[in-house]
Amino acid sequence: MNTKEIRKRKGFYFCLLAFTSVLLLLLLSVVSLFWPTRRFSASERRNLAQRPKLSYEGIVDGTFSNEVESYLADQYPARDIWVYLNSLQNRILGIDYQNGIYRGKDGYLIQGFEKSEIGKEDQEKQKILNSFLERNSQLQSYVMLVPTASWILKDLLPSGAPQGDEKSWYESWISTSKISELSNVTVVDCADELAEAVKTNQIYYRTDHHWTTYGASAAFKELAKQMDIPYEEDDFEAYTVHAKFQGTMMSSSGFYSGTKDTIDLYLPKEPETILVTNKEAQTTTTTIYSEEGLLGNDPYEVFLGGNYGLLNIQTSSQSGRKLLLLKDSYANAMIGFLTPYFSEIDIVDPRYYSSDLDMQIAVNQYTDLLILYNLQSFAKDSSLALVLGEEAAE
């Protein structure tokens, strides 16, 4: 067979392969139009795109075509099998990084820390936060920035994984912000407690970016010490409420994992009375835990039922202390450790809060302020600075 014939055959095979691939994609797209629509992917831990509604505006601005593309991508037949095969292919090819997430050892998916130094945005946030704390000097304030798995479990990252240094960034942020020099502010460093706790138990979920309730309990030891709270570990008892938890980092990364974790609730042995009011939804409940959240798409929402702009918790505690908590979702797992020691707690999530925080502080007689974030979200967050008020930016 001469060279010309070989090239001709190769060209024919390439054309046949391309034609077959296009035909297969078209066939799957057509079949997906008649395939039963799924709302949720259990393996990816996320909601799937639904059939888009045809509209003139959508066609003109291009949103309809984008929605169709998302719908076909999410609803093609046997999606879970294809997702698993893609994950298997990535593993075979040695791909350990997708969308900011590393596939680590021991079944862990670990969100990489992207920053390595203090930037201009960080400095502006420092200025705003310091101003807020100074003008509310009547409050005894605590700032607790929680290390994530990329710091505490850095040995589980894949070898050679390029990343920012979370510990170094934290130490630089605390140092340059001079926040610890404010007389009414205590910086609560829980890194040592977490580093010690991880030796005996699991402090982070393996497929989710949150810490476990055990991790929260370990950090609370240090927080209780700094807040002068008479906390004893034996005052709480752990109960497993979910034994097959898989987190949102699977869907974010595309790294399918069969790994499942447990979700535990730490309940005080002494009975307590609680009334939780969602100020925006104007609803009340007698527990900080949500059965609906536990049984929903994201079982981590068993804590508080999710994230809301403003929640008020009144307890049976006779301490007389009233806490204002500014937080991200990491704090949700720690609320249960706080309720026995505060008569009232107002919880503000700046991402969803639209009221005037300065006015809220002026109206309420808080004794304590706690700012609790994980370092990943704190480094990226812009909502906290916005909520701290216009006065701070002047």
Language model regions located:
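Extracellular glycan-modifying ectodomains
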Residues: 1-394
